């Protein structure tokens, strides 16, 4: 009700009244992810991306199964120098909102980001999912060391590869999951735990093709056609085993501190 009423005020140009309605709603429903989303959207429309992220990430923590806050936060980080948070939020979004048009769009975006942030030259592979410069934080220092831990594991994972396509990206992520689990125990999170479950069930390769499939549909179709039994087995398991995120295991920048 508060979301609809606030949206109605926003549509007739009364953005201040809309914000007031959303804030009133949060006083009564403090875990309403949809209201955090709307407050974030209001900030985003005004170009205030730092405070938009504040609301989106508060929404993620308050209502961790509500997908849209992950989606909006991911898009902001994709346009920043801290893409690491974008790829984490983007993948979690896809797990929560499967098979929608936004999910397909996120698949393409994730593949694009991985392709841009992993590069190959004469001296080997380069990984650049984050920058020492903080773009969207009020802190004078980086909020936590998760990005460095992510990059370290990714650098180890890309060794030996010369190109990036779906097949090599799967191999990289297989090695990354092992490396991250072994050396970044303090940053274990709901997504890395889900990866370990997929690996244990033998479905991680198929999952990676599902995750990035819309980034290269031809390559995906070729793999699926050659691995139909493996693909069908993954889909059956995937349907019965959705990710479960709650306040005790929710992933955000600030739960990684």
PLM regions with names:
Residues 28-29, 62, 96:
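Structural marker of alpha-solenoid helical repeat scaffolds
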Residues 3-4, 38, 72, 109:
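Canonical tetratricopeptide repeat
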Residues 24-25, 58-59, 93:
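Canonical positions in the second alpha-helix
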Residues 81-102, 108-118, 125-129:
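TPR/TPR-like (Sel1-like) alpha-helical repeat modules
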Residues 32-34, 67-68, 101:
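Helix-start (N-cap) detector for alpha-helical repeat units in TPR-like alpha-solenoids
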């Amino acid at each position: 009700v508060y979301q609809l009423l606030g949206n109605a005020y926003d549509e007739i140009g009364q953005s201040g009244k809309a914000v007031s309605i959303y804030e009133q709603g949060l006083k009564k429903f403090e875990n309403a992810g949809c209201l955090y989303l709307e407050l974030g959207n209001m900030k985003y429309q005004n170009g205030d991306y730092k405070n938009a992220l504040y609301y989106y990430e508060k929404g993620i923590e308050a209502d961790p199964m509500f997908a849209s806050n992950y989606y909006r936060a991911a898009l902001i980080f994709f346009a920043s120098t801290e893409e690491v948070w974008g790829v984490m939020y983007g993948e979690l979004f896809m797990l929560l909102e499967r098979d929608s048009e936004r999910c397909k769009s996120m698949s393409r975006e994730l593949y694009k980001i991985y392709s841009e942030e992993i590069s190959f030259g004469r001296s080997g592979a380069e990984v650049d999912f984050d920058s020492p410069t903080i773009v969207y934080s009020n802190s004078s220092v980086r909020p936590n060391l998760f990005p460095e831990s992510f990059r370290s594991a990714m650098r180890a994972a890309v060794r030996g590869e010369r190109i990036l396509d779906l097949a090599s990206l799967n191999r990289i992520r297989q090695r990354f999951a092992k490396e991250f689990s072994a050396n970044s125990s303090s940053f274990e999170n709901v997504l890395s735990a889900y990866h370990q479950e997929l690996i244990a069930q033998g479905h991680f390769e198929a999952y990676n093709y599902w995750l990035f499939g819309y980034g290269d549909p031809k390559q995906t179709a070729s793999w699926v056609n050659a691995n139909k039994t493996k693909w069908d087995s993954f889909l059956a398991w995937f349907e019965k085993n959705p990710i479960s995120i709650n306040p005790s295991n929710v992933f955000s920048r600030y739960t990684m501190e």
